[in-house]
Amino acid sequence: MKKLKLMTIVGTRPEIIKMSAIIKKADKYFDHILVHTGQNYDYNLNEVFFKDLGLREPNYYLGVVGKNIGETMGNVISKAYDLMVEVKPDAVIVLGDTNSCLSIIAAKRLKIPIFHMEAGNRCKDENLPEEVIRRIVDVTSDVNLCYSEHARRYILDTGVKPEYTYVVGSPMAEVLKDVLPQIEASTVLGDLGLEKGKYILLSAHREENIDIEANFMSLMNAVNEMARTYDMPVLYSCHPRSEKMIEKRGFKFDERVIQHKPLGFFDYNKLQQNAFCVVSDSGTVPEEGAFFHFPAVSVRTSTERPEAMDKGVFTIGSITSEAVCQAVALATEMHANGDDPYPVPAYTDENVSTKVVKLIQSYVGIINKMVWRKA
C-alpha cells in the first residue's frame, strides 16, 4: 500500500533536536523525505546531533546560506520550491521560527498541506527576528501544533482556524527520556576537569545579544562578574557567531571563564544536569530545566515560554551585569533550599511524536478537500 509522502524540513540544532523523535516515527510510518536546508553549516551545530540522536542522514541538503540574510531567506524558498516540484510530497512539516521555516511559502504556492510544530509561541519583542517569522509561519500553515494552551490562545488571536489548531505538548521530554542513558554515561565533567555543582554553564548566541554591541558588552561583563562572585569556572559553550564577535571586539574574559566549542547533545545535557546554574539565551532551556530541575537563568528580556514561567522553571535575568548576577543568586539559593518549580504539564508528554504522526495522517485529506478543493 502506498504511504503518505511527508517532507520534514530542518536547518538548525534546536530543530534537529526537537524533531528527532518525530523524524524517527515518520521514517517508520510514512514515505519520509528528510531535508536539511544548511542554515547552520558548522559540524558541531548540526551533524554531530544527527549522530548523537541516532538519526539517519537527510535525503537532501539545500545549501541555502548566501552572502547576506536576504539572499539566504530567498534561497530557502527557491530551493525548497524546486525540491517540492521534483519529489511531490503530500505534506510538509517544520518546527519553530528559523529562516528554514520560510520553506513553507513554497509549499503554500504548490498547495501542499503544511504542519507547523511549536506554533503560537510569542515573546512580544519585535527586536527578535524569530518573532516576525513566527507570525508568518503560523498564518501560512494549514495545521498548527502548539506546545501549550498559552500558545493556542496567542495563535487563535491571529485569526487562524481553531478546528485546525491542536495542543500536542513539547517534544523535549520524549527526546530526553529516549537518550537519558547516554546522557548519564557522559564523561564530560571528568574530561573537562569540572566538579558537580561547582561550575556555571553559559550559552549565549542570539542575534540581539551578540550583534548589538551594547548588549554584547553588558552580557560579557556579567560573565566576568559571575566568575569573580562565585569563584568557580564559567564554561561558555561558544557558537562560531559568538566567537567571531569576541575576537572582533577584543574582549578579555576572567581567567575562570572557559571558552569551549559547542558540545554534543549528551555532553551538554550532562553539564546542564550537574551545573551550579545554567545561564542561557536558548529557547529550549525552560524545557530542559523542567526535565532536569537545574537552576536556570535566561539572559533575555522576554520569553516565548510563559507556561514555564507560570510554574517557576526559570528566571529572566535580562543582560545587565547586576540583573544577571541577582537572578543567578536567587535561582541558586532557592534551589539549595529545595524551593523548586512545579512540573509544567505541557512539557511532560512522552508520546508527542505519536500524536503528530496521527494528526498529519488525519488532516492531509481534510486540508486538500476543505482548503484546496481537490477532488
Report the location of each language-model feature.
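Nucleotide-activated sugar donor-binding and catalytic core shared by glycosyltransferases
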Residues: 1-232, 242-375
